[in-house]
Curated annotation (Swiss-Prot):
It is found in: Cytoplasm. Belongs to the AB hydrolase superfamily. Lipase family. It comes from Oryza sativa subsp. japonica. GO terms for biological process: lipid catabolic process. Acylhydrolase that catalyzes the hydrolysis of phospholipids at the sn-1 position. The active site is at 226 (acyl-ester intermediate), 226 (charge relay system), 296 (charge relay system), 334 (charge relay system). GO terms for molecular function: phospholipase A1 activity. Keywords: Cytoplasm, Hydrolase, Lipid degradation, Lipid metabolism. GO terms for cellular component: cytoplasm. This is Phospholipase A1-II 6. It is an enzyme of class 3 (hydrolase). Its EC number is 3.1.1.-. The keyword Hydrolase applies. The lineage of its organism: Eukaryota, Viridiplantae, Streptophyta, Embryophyta, Tracheophyta. It holds the Pfam family Lipase_3.
Length: 411
């Protein structure tokens, strides 16, 4: 599949509009077709972090990516992305404060590679082919969330702290969730993966790519789901607040390239002071589109007040889909593939009814759970590694081999 076929006709010409230059005014209702495709495209880049994540606790590679950076999108079965983007770096996170177990997966193997760190996402950049199709050189940061039980969001404490290091001045009253900030900024000098924080890993790679392509038209796009959406919100703000969207040779007063976050099922990130500071960064090129499923509980946490949402909301309701079981359950309502199914069909028919306006295989909704009606004859949770990573050797013995050897080549 070529990049142009995958994107649709309007993306290159309208990319600034689709990335929120006018805050998506007039594009959400009725739901613009090119915007649907754009939201789905970045959602698939977030979904790839789930599809690649090794959550087999018995594996020494639990918590890492099963896919190598060089073949990442190909292995994630995203041929359009494979032509349009290359992964420049994998990103790892840890936390210096206690967080619920689903947020940091710990291997039970004595030979485990990661003890207190997990692979949390990647930085990618448009290829030359992708640049031609997209209309600019796009830098993407994709953050992984959690696919475990949703009890973690209810079990967390909701303490807010100042976002130290993220703000240029110390007088701000901005406050953010302690757990999200810790995942974003924590480092561990004893770790093989987190001597630098997730924040430092991402910002150094973004700075490198902005410098490398500073003579071209650039955009920075950040995406994530659930926990990944919270990290994406902090990251997008951080990039703009601290000028990482500006080329090194740019004049002091020069505008940086646009930074847009497309986030899904996002918990709230901070209080009113953070919202005010986030809104104030619009003038520096920051935009955020927050996709929320009507029945999903995660966007309702942490409670408001004192927490406040940021950005522009895109509301969907997967309960209106004729393809999905009714009423469903919390896991299905929160599932990213079901979100993308909802984006493909929300308000796509007459009188705002659900109808797939984008041809997207409904089988994807059953990738992790049994969301589809039985009449579609798609097994529940069908996305699993072949033989769960077990490989038969020449000696007839079966061995767990669930990691491509050049995984760390993008670090």
């Amino acid at each position: 599949m070529s990049s142009q076929q995958w994107l649709g006709d309007g993306t290159a010409r309208r990319w600034r509009e689709l990335h929120g230059e006018s805050d998506w005014d007039g594009l959400l209702d009725p739901f613009d077709l090119d915007l649907r495709r754009t939201v789905i495209r970045y959602g698939e880049m977030a979904q790839a972090t789930y599809d690649a994540f090794n959550h087999e606790k018995l594996s020494p590679h639990a918590g890492l990516s099963r896919f190598a950076a060089r073949r990442f999108f190909e292995r994630a079965q995203l041929p359009g992305h494979s032509a349009a983007y290359r992964v420049a770096r994998f990103v790892y996170a840890t936390s210096c404060v206690a967080v619920p177990e689903p947020l940091i997966l710990r291997s039970a193997s004595r030979a485990r590679r990661c003890r207190e760190s997990n692979w949390i996402g990647y930085v990618a950049v448009a290829t030359d082919e992708g640049k031609a199709a997209l209309g600019r050189r796009d830098i993407v940061v994709a953050w992984r969330g959690t696919v475990q039980s949703l009890e973690w969001i209810k079990d967390m404490d909701f303490v807010m702290v100042p976002p130290k290091g993220l703000l240029r001045d110390k007088a701000s009253d901005a406050m953010v969730h302690r757990g999200w900030l810790s995942m974003y900024t924590s480092r561990d000098s004893e770790s093989s993966h987190n001597k630098d924080s997730a924040r430092d890993q991402v910002l150094s790679e973004v700075a490198k790519l902005v410098s490398m392509y500073q003579d071209e038209e650039l955009s920075i796009t950040v995406t994530g789901h659930s926990l990944g959406a919270a990290l994406a919100t902090l990251n997008a703000f951080d990039i703009v607040e601290n000028g990482y969207n500006r080329a090194p040779r740019a004049a002091a007063a020069a505008a940086g390239c646009p930074v847009t976050a497309f986030v899904f099922a996002s918990p709230r990130v901070g209080g009113h002071g953070f919202k005010r500071r986030f809104d104030g960064a619009r003038g520096l090129g920051l935009r955020l589109l927050r996709v929320r499923n009507a029945r999903d509980v995660v966007p309702r946490y942490p409670p408001a007040p004192p927490y406040h949402g940021v950005g522009t909301e895109l509301a969907i309701d997967t309960g209106e889909s004729p393809y999905l079981r009714r009423p469903g359950n919390e896991l299905v309502w929160h599932n990213l593939e079901c979100y993308l199914h909802g984006v493909a069909g929300a308000r796509g028919g007459e009188a705002g009814r659900f109808k797939l306006a984008v041809e997207r295989d409904v089988a994807l909704a059953n990738k992790s759970y049994g969301a589809l009606r039985d009449e579609h004859a798609v097994p529940a949770g069908w996305w699993i590694p072949s033989n769960r990573g077990m490989v038969r050797g020449a000696d007839g013995r079966w061995t767990l081999m669930d990691r491509e050897e050049d995984e760390d080549s993008a670090e």
